[in-house]
Design a protein with these regions (language model features):
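Alpha-helical transmembrane segments and their immediate juxtamembrane cytosolic regions
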Residues: 1-281
């Protein structure tokens, strides 16, 4: 079986998602967590925009979208309920219908904002490209960009930076080239990544820094993983990369459950034992 570079990228990204939501990691390495948070979900959104297929019937696309929305609603509702009982970051104080509806459709909660953004951008993408069928690709792209900007500017449901990276992924998709033909795997790309990571004020670069970090990451990660000669390891990496959605949906449950095991690893100041526990789950 041939493993796709996108699977490698998504595997590393989903592992980072799990890692930064481990409370012990956040406590031990706050600067590392902040750095990862600065760019990695934007890289994920770029890949998501690239992978979305709008060459589907309305029924097929609705089915695809509901496979995101239904689990999203279930998990957000559950997460919100648990947050009223346990000390969960970004939780809600009351479990009432208005608060839950606002959480599901407007603000989202915890890590599930990604699925919220994914669904909104995907619906706008599909509708703008299919309702104006006779328009040129450039015309459709401009219309798509306009709607993304309007929604992000005049509603609270979409972040403009996140929308921009999803849009970038769509643009790369429309080039009709493989992603690794556009963002070529190269170890050289680790240099700007390390350079920005070493700058104490890298956040002052804002969108430019996020863009460089995301593109550099998507370039050097496949090259690093390609150097692994063990086919079994590559198979596991590819499998994880192809199954990021269920991992993303359920990883808060793993991290919450992992808190109960923290006392067992009080001797481990590095936090390594806790991380191993979460990944074994």
């Amino acid at each position: 079986m041939k493993y796709n570079n996108i699977d490698y990228q998504r595997c590393v990204l989903i592992c980072m998602v799990v890692m930064i939501h481990i409370v012990n990691f956040s406590t031990l390495y706050p600067d590392v967590k902040n750095f990862i948070n600065f760019f990695f979900m934007q890289a994920f959104l770029l890949i998501t925009g690239y992978l979305v297929n709008i060459r589907k019937t309305y029924k097929e696309f609705a089915s695809y979208t509901m496979k995101i929305i239904i689990p999203y609603i279930i998990m957000v509702t559950s997460y919100a309920f648990v947050s009223t009982l346990l000390p969960v970051r970004d939780g809600v104080n009351e479990f009432t219908i208005p608060i839950i509806l606002n959480t599901i459709f407007v603000t989202s909660i915890g890590p599930y904002w990604f699925l919220h953004t994914m669904a909104i951008c995907g619906i706008i993408y599909y509708l703008t490209f299919n309702l104006v069928g006779k328009w040129s690709i450039m015309g459709k792209l401009c219309l798509f960009a306009t709607f993304l900007m309007l929604v992000s500017q005049y509603t609270p449901v979409l972040n403009s930076t996140n929308a921009a990276f999803y849009f970038t992924g769509v643009c790369l998709r429309l080039s009709e080239k493989r992603l690794d033909e556009i963002i070529k795997p190269s170890l050289w790309s680790i240099l700007p990544f390390i350079a920005i990571a070493s700058f104490p004020n890298y956040k002052n670069w804002n969108f430019l820094a996020v863009t460089i970090l995301a593109l550099s990451f998507l370039s050097f990660v496949p090259k690093l993983i390609q150097s692994i000669n063990n086919k079994k390891v590559l198979g596991i990496i590819g499998f994880i990369g192809r199954n990021t959605l269920p991992i993303y949906l359920f990883h808060p449950i793993f991290t919450m459950g992992g808190k109960l095991a923290l006392p067992l690893f009080h001797f481990d100041n590095s936090g390594g034992g806790t991380y191993g526990l979460h990944y074994c789950r």
